[in-house]
């Protein structure tokens, strides 16, 4: 390919970029499983190591709405989480899909340059985010911390960000299973859910000593209260701490999403180059997986962050108030939207709150379902999964839809794929709303991300590890 290209700009940086060397031969499944475990262990350790030099990490968290989705843990080395990787990946996917950068993924040099450019951008994002976090006072006033401590904090965050990038690359290049992004997000969510279910810590907020974990609290209340009926009601519906109803709702959503993963349309296809039995091309209900809810969550979370920062700086400005006004709730330091655009796209914190403000609830449902459907249909166009792209792949591989002419594949796919993408995106959005209204142990977005990721790992293990029959098939057959 002749001429100058944007990707050529990264060539001078290639020798200086940290890199995981690809394996010379395919790594055995057991070894990949081991490296996945090692990667996960490193992530968990980094999530618990506090940043050295911070003065304080108390008070309202402007990134509260993004923490679980980005596998971020405040005040630790995993402060940035997977944010640099996700942001860089989405930007370059968009640039590639819209043809703003030219790259031939079948060409190894192009592919390597594209990955290097994406990695370089992720590192630059880590530097930028770390600098902004420190200078905006997330760990204390910069003037009080001093230049040396501020620089040390930035270096810690950037170093941790580079480690996460390399851990993700380690898995992506075949040493482990799946990707670091999915693994870290699912682990972070599962850790939070497990803690809220079984935490042995106690708190006293006016009703005596209570256990934080829903299951532990259930047994404690049944054992310590004489009125067992009242104890059960308290364990299932207490509002100030995780309860059993939330845990059951979380398990129900997990099973429901696994069941819905089995919904698909299977198109019979055959090869024009050789004779043989028909194959099947599956088009799933969740055609774009969890991408719609990730994009919707990223959009609303960024609105929350911008609105909250503007409100703290200019609380009386009319335009800032239109975007959103914020206030704390009783017993919590975290700020929540109380009016403006941010209020109407903020999920209700309980089913009772949803009933008390039906207009806000209706607007929120329309926003989530509509945005997920739009993001899903848009994503297939920029990610190479549109009807035209799939029809092109069929042609290149010598495949046709059984019972149709070679030239009719695009028309048949156009009838199915956009509908599946839009309906699947709206379904993901509806499940997220259901999670938020039912008060699952974690936001709707984070629960869906973890379930789809865990199921993806199950399918990968079933395919590469030689496991037996799909759980979805048996679950669907049982129902």
Swiss-Prot record:
<feature type="transmembrane region" description="Helical">
    <location>
        <begin position="362"/>
        <end position="382"/>
    </location>
</feature>
<dbReference type="GO" id="GO:0005048">
    <property type="term" value="F:signal sequence binding"/>
</dbReference>
<keyword id="KW-0653">Protein transport</keyword>
<feature type="topological domain" description="Cytoplasmic">
    <location>
        <begin position="1"/>
        <end position="33"/>
    </location>
</feature>
<feature type="transmembrane region" description="Helical">
    <location>
        <begin position="77"/>
        <end position="97"/>
    </location>
</feature>
<dbReference type="Pfam" id="PF00344">
    <property type="entry name" value="SecY"/>
</dbReference>
<dbReference type="Pfam" id="PF10559">
    <property type="entry name" value="Plug_translocon"/>
</dbReference>
<feature type="topological domain" description="Lumenal">
    <location>
        <begin position="55"/>
        <end position="76"/>
    </location>
</feature>
<feature type="topological domain" description="Lumenal">
    <location>
        <begin position="141"/>
        <end position="146"/>
    </location>
</feature>
<dbReference type="GO" id="GO:0006616">
    <property type="term" value="P:SRP-dependent cotranslational protein targeting to membrane, translocation"/>
</dbReference>
<dbReference type="InterPro" id="IPR002208">
    <property type="entry name" value="SecY/SEC61-alpha"/>
</dbReference>
<keyword id="KW-0811">Translocation</keyword>
<dbReference type="GO" id="GO:0031204">
    <property type="term" value="P:post-translational protein targeting to membrane, translocation"/>
</dbReference>
<feature type="transmembrane region" description="Helical">
    <location>
        <begin position="441"/>
        <end position="458"/>
    </location>
</feature>
<comment type="subunit">
    <text>Heterotrimeric complex composed of SEC61-alpha, SEC61-beta and SEC61-gamma.</text>
</comment>
<feature type="transmembrane region" description="Helical">
    <location>
        <begin position="247"/>
        <end position="267"/>
    </location>
</feature>
<dbReference type="InterPro" id="IPR023201">
    <property type="entry name" value="SecY_dom_sf"/>
</dbReference>
<dbReference type="GO" id="GO:0000324">
    <property type="term" value="C:fungal-type vacuole"/>
</dbReference>
<keyword id="KW-0472">Membrane</keyword>
<comment type="function">
    <text>Appears to play a crucial role in the insertion of secretory and membrane polypeptides into the ER. It is required for assembly of membrane and secretory proteins and is essential for cell growth. It interacts with other membrane proteins required for protein translocation. Upon binding to SEC62/63 complex, secretory precursor polypeptides may engage SEC61 to begin membrane penetration event. A cycle of assembly and disassembly of SEC62/63 from SEC61 may govern the activity of the translocase.</text>
</comment>
<feature type="transmembrane region" description="Helical">
    <location>
        <begin position="147"/>
        <end position="167"/>
    </location>
</feature>
<dbReference type="GO" id="GO:1904680">
    <property type="term" value="F:peptide transmembrane transporter activity"/>
</dbReference>
<protein>
    <recommendedName>
        <fullName>Protein transport protein SEC61 subunit alpha</fullName>
    </recommendedName>
</protein>
<dbReference type="GO" id="GO:0030970">
    <property type="term" value="P:retrograde protein transport, ER to cytosol"/>
</dbReference>
<feature type="transmembrane region" description="Helical">
    <location>
        <begin position="120"/>
        <end position="140"/>
    </location>
</feature>
<feature type="topological domain" description="Lumenal">
    <location>
        <begin position="435"/>
        <end position="440"/>
    </location>
</feature>
<feature type="topological domain" description="Cytoplasmic">
    <location>
        <begin position="459"/>
        <end position="479"/>
    </location>
</feature>
<dbReference type="InterPro" id="IPR019561">
    <property type="entry name" value="Translocon_Sec61/SecY_plug_dom"/>
</dbReference>
<keyword id="KW-0813">Transport</keyword>
<comment type="similarity">
    <text>Belongs to the SecY/SEC61-alpha family.</text>
</comment>
<feature type="topological domain" description="Lumenal">
    <location>
        <begin position="268"/>
        <end position="361"/>
    </location>
</feature>
<feature type="topological domain" description="Cytoplasmic">
    <location>
        <begin position="383"/>
        <end position="415"/>
    </location>
</feature>
<feature type="topological domain" description="Cytoplasmic">
    <location>
        <begin position="168"/>
        <end position="246"/>
    </location>
</feature>
<dbReference type="GO" id="GO:0005784">
    <property type="term" value="C:Sec61 translocon complex"/>
</dbReference>
<keyword id="KW-1133">Transmembrane helix</keyword>
<feature type="transmembrane region" description="Helical">
    <location>
        <begin position="34"/>
        <end position="54"/>
    </location>
</feature>
<dbReference type="GO" id="GO:0070843">
    <property type="term" value="P:misfolded protein transport"/>
</dbReference>
<dbReference type="InterPro" id="IPR030659">
    <property type="entry name" value="SecY_CS"/>
</dbReference>
<keyword id="KW-0256">Endoplasmic reticulum</keyword>
<dbReference type="GO" id="GO:0015450">
    <property type="term" value="F:protein-transporting ATPase activity"/>
</dbReference>
<keyword id="KW-0812">Transmembrane</keyword>
<feature type="topological domain" description="Cytoplasmic">
    <location>
        <begin position="98"/>
        <end position="119"/>
    </location>
</feature>
